[in-house]
Amino acid sequence: MGSEALAYALRLLARKGYSRAALRAKLAARFGEAEAEAALGRLEAMGYLDDRAYARAFVETRARRYGPRKLRALLLARGVPEEVVEEVLPEARVEEALAVLRRYRHREDKARAVRFLEGRGFPLGVALEAWRLAQEEGEGYK
């Protein structure tokens, strides 16, 4: 009872990280609700399933490309509980937005650059400040 679900879950987790909700959906579709919950309980007890660790790793791997709003949306879409998301997300920093902006091809166009940063999840104020700093640094921004 549940050993097939547990083995399947371990195979999935060996390939990539999953949030509890995402793994629960996969297991429930294949084995049913009761077996899925039993397997998830065992995985959590063994330390193989942890939403906080998953969210931290997710943010670490994507923080260079996305701002906090985008990361928040991605984590919530993957079923990470909101309290965990709020705990692991960093505050939007102008330095991070500036680093992203430096890699952007159309950085000389203010409107495009700010829209780009907003699309990456940076708040408008942070995007504007990053653009202003880049302009002051004299990196060819207009």
From Swiss-Prot:
Q: Which family does it belong to?
A: Belongs to the RecX family.
Compartments, as annotated in UniProt: Cytoplasm
What gene codes for this chain? recX
Per the record, a Pfam family? RecX_HTH2
Q: What does this protein do?
A: Modulates RecA activity.
Which GO terms fall under biological process for this protein?
regulation of DNA repair
Q: Does the keyword Cytoplasm apply?
A: yes
Q: What is this protein called?
A: Regulatory protein RecX
**Keyword terms:** Cytoplasm
What GO CC annotations are associated with the protein?
Answer: cytoplasm
Which Cys-Cys disulphide bridges does the record give?
A: none
In its UniProt entry, the species of origin is given as: Thermus thermophilus (strain ATCC BAA-163 / DSM 7039 / HB27)
User: Any coiled-coil ranges, and where?
Assistant: none
